[in-house]
Curated annotation (Swiss-Prot):
Pathway: Purine metabolism; AMP biosynthesis via de novo pathway; AMP from IMP: step 1/2. Its cofactor is Mg(2+). The active site is at 40 (proton acceptor), 68 (proton donor). Mg(2+) binds at residues 40, 67. Pfam families: Adenylsucc_synt. Substrate binds at residues 40, 328-334. PROSITE patterns: ADENYLOSUCCIN_SYN_1 (PS01266), ADENYLOSUCCIN_SYN_2 (PS00513). The lineage of its organism: Eukaryota, Metazoa, Chordata, Craniata, Vertebrata. Homodimer. It comes from Xenopus laevis. Keywords: Cytoplasm, GTP-binding, Ligase, Magnesium, Metal-binding, Nucleotide-binding, Purine biosynthesis. Gene3D superfamilies: Adenylosuccinate Synthetase, subunit A, domain 1, Adenylosuccinate Synthetase, subunit A, domain 2, Adenylosuccinate Synthetase, subunit A, domain 3. This is Adenylosuccinate synthetase isozyme 1 A.
Length: 454
């Protein structure tokens, strides 16, 4: 009888009788900054603005293939693997599980920036124990694969040769090694490292790996990073559910470089759209707050692949030279063209931008007129989508809206009213076409030249 009584005793059931079910509190939300084109939109600059009053700044995907330049007090800092918020002495920088880490690259980057004045970074950096490691042979393989592609197809992907793709390949084929493996039993790690190296050598006959030399270095790096490593899932959970905190997520690469949604195969090997934030940090979607898309006032692309609004002419040259369009990571000349709103709308469909940052508006100051790509035509017919297939994307014709240039210097503008009416019209046109407000307009290199509109 006692068993029945227990089962009828409503008080033993949470939520039964007079007891309220525990209400799930969402906790703090993260603010996300993502590239809305092919990268190099100026994400670092927006991060820098928001990082000054953030408590935690996170990276969730990619590796040191990203390049962010931040100018503080006249000093230019270059970040590849570090969140660019590492400059903020009051904030914690977190490298999430979705990031792939080349340890020599991490310390080289630290040294370079220390020489410029970065202090105590190791006290502010936390690394997820689940992040995968980029080995030197991954980088070598990256280069060898590119040579192979060039020989077989006469074209390459335009990789940064930082070993990112091969590392994500190891991760997907479940042979990769993580930070937690490096910090556990080193004999076990060494055995798995040797297997992984041999596996790559069997695929690439001319790949040389100094296994013992590498392991010696890795053992040294293990001790250097040990104090910085935490279980990333628990770290993020505490950050979200502890005291109120401002948490910023700095996306690397951009929407059209996303492994799923980008211009495949000319993409990177991770998700650089909003989904990568959840998988790369181990947080639920309800903790994603504002998502800011960063878009340049024109379009650039590094390496090969379709680029519908590209201008291989005087306009392209003006944008390239005025915009100093050279890659931070590769030093390669960027291809330039008109602003493409088909791409921007597509990026918004995937990411759900709550607002945009429109950067480098000042580069357009000298132009007599501007064109904005508003639709694609295929065989003379308007198509209502962004084509997935690269051969089709190569064939589209762009429908342009032509707008008169403002022909005046905007670099001194610090508020909306300082901008010429025609520049204001250009911005409003973008907002109305995409249906997302522009929150910042960039008219120069410094922090002060980001005009905040609301």
């Amino acid at each position: 009888m006692s068993g029945t009584r227990a089962s009828n005793d409503r008080s033993s059931h949470p939520g039964a009788g007079g007891h309220k079910r525990p209400r799930y509190d969402v906790g703090n939300k993260v603010t996300v900054i993502l590239g809305a084109q092919w990268g190099d939109e100026g994400k670092g600059k927006v991060v820098d603005l928001l990082a000054t009053d953030s408590d935690i700044i996170c990276r969730c995907q990619g590796g040191n293939n990203a390049g962010h330049t931040v100018v503080v007090e006249g000093k230019e800092y270059d970040f590849h693997l570090f969140p660019s918020g590492i400059i903020n002495p009051k904030a914690i920088s977190f490298i999430g599980n979705g990031v792939v880490i080349h340890l020599p690259g991490l310390f080289e980057e630290a040294d370079k920036n220390e020489k410029k004045g970065l202090k105590d970074w190791e006290k502010r950096l936390i690394i997820s124990d689940r992040a995968h490691i980029v080995f030197d042979f991954h980088q070598a393989v990256d280069g060898l694969q590119e040579v192979q592609r060039q020989a077989q197809e006469g074209k390459n992907i335009g990789t940064t040769k930082k070993g990112i793709g091969p590392t994500y390949s190891s991760k997907a084929s479940r042979t990769g090694l993580r930070i937690c493996d490096l910090l556990s039993d080193f004999d076990e790690f060494s055995a798995r490292f040797k297997n992984l190296a041999h596996q790559h050598q069997s695929m690439f006959s001319n790949l040389e790996v100094d296994v013992e030399g590498q392991l010696k270095k890795l053992k040294m790096y293990a001790e250097k990073i040990r104090p910085m490593v935490r279980d990333g899932v628990y770290f993020m959970y505490e950050a979200l559910h502890g005291s109120p905190k401002k948490i910023l997520v700095e996306g690397a690469n951009a929407a059209l470089l996303d492994i799923d949604f980008g211009t495949y195969p000319f993409v990177t090997s991770s998700n650089c759209t909003v989904g990568g934030v959840c998988t790369g940090l181990g947080i639920p979607p309800q903790n994603v707050g504002d998502v800011y898309g960063v878009v340049k006032a024109y379009t650039t692309r590094v390496g090969i692949g379709a680029f519908p609004t590209e201008q291989i002419n005087e306009i392209g040259n003006i944008l390239q030279t005025r915009g100093h369009e050279w890659g931070v990571t590769t030093g390669r000349k960027r291809r330039c063209g008109w602003l493409d709103l088909v791409i921007l709308r597509y990026a918004h469909m995937i990411n759900g931008f709550t607002a945009l940052a429109l950067t480098k508006l000042d580069i357009l100051d000298v132009l007599d007129e501007m064109k904005i790509g508003v639709a694609y035509r295929l065989n003379g017919k308007r198509i209502p989508y962004f084509p997935a297939n690269q051969e089709i994307l190569q064939k589209v014709e762009v429908e342009y809206e032509v707008m008169p240039g403002w022909k005046s210097d905007t670099t001194g503008a610090r508020k909306w009213e300082d901008l010429p009416t025609r520049a204001q019209n250009y911005i409003r046109f973008v907002e109305n076409h995409i249906g997302v407000p522009v929150k910042w307009v960039g008219v120069g290199k410094s922090r002060e030249s980001m005009i905040e509109l609301f």
